[in-house]
Every structure is written in C-alpha cells, then in structure tokens.
Amino acid sequence: MAGGGETARHYIGTGRKLGMDESMLDDLGLRAARLNAELLVGGLGDAAYPTVPEDMNQVAEAFTTGKVVVVGGFHPGHSTNAVAALIAERVHANLFVNATDVDGVYTSDPNKNPRAKKLDRVTTSQLKKMFGNGQMHAGTYELLDLLAVNIIERSKIRTVILKCDPSAIRKAIQGELIGTLVVV
C-alpha cells in the first residue's frame, strides 16, 4: 500500500488554501497515493502485478498471480492504513506490517516530544485511546486511524508497526520482534 506522502500533503495544503472542501482534498490525497503506487509498480518491474488495483475484488484477483501487488487507496476519506488493513483481512494475511516514518508506536509524537517513549507492545484498546479522537482531516492521519485499528482488532491479524526500512521489514517478516507489536 503506497501512501500519498509529501506529494499528497503538498496538494492537500494547496487545495485547502484554495478553499476546497474535505472530500475534494481526500480525493487529491488518494490520487497522490495511486500515483506513488504506479511508481512502485514501475520500480519493481516484472516482480509486480502490472496495474494498480482500484477495488478489493481486483486486489483479491491480483494476489492469485503470486506477483507483488501495489495498491494506492480506493475511497476518499479512508486512510491508506485502513485500506491496507482491509486488504490484509481480505487476503487472510498472517502479518500486517505498517512501515512508517517512525520505528514504532510512542507515548506521544517522537518528532515533537524528545521524551516520548517507544512501546514494544500495545493493545488495540490503547491504540483506540491514542488515535481515536474522532477528528479526521484530509492528509492528517495519525500513525493509525480508528478505522484501521478496528479492522486490525476484528480480524485479529498480527500487526507490527515499524520504520520504513527494508532490513526492518525483512526482520519483521522473519518473525523477529522489531518495532511495536499490536496485541488484540
């Protein structure tokens, strides 16, 4: 699952200055995520499924090919984290890895608070308290949003949140405890 990243934040910020409503801003973010997904497909070459799926049925079909499936979001208003959790649930994945810009879940934003403590394990209930404030604006999703946490909880999928680094992802896939383990 590719997120929109800086590209999305740039377009959303510009759109907000132009007076676009939140649904239009969500759509800009989704388009940026899909554009990033197209770049990833190109970078992966023959290892990747050749197109970016646009709905859950296309994802399920693409997974049957054995190729790497890169997705960039489906619906405005749904974070890429929530869609990624839905995909993990749909394909019955045994591990959901959320690779992000920090190396796990912290007691507060480590980019803003140098005293923030990294948590090795966190429950979905704790995550709901941390990220479930109910406020949602385009391009401002926290580490996880409430919908993503609820999907992780209902599917009981093993979830690890870690730094977006190939060696960290490899370690998580191999079963090494790295980042933060989400406990249902």
What are these regions (language model features)?
Residues 2-184:
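C-terminal catalytic "cap/lid" subdomain
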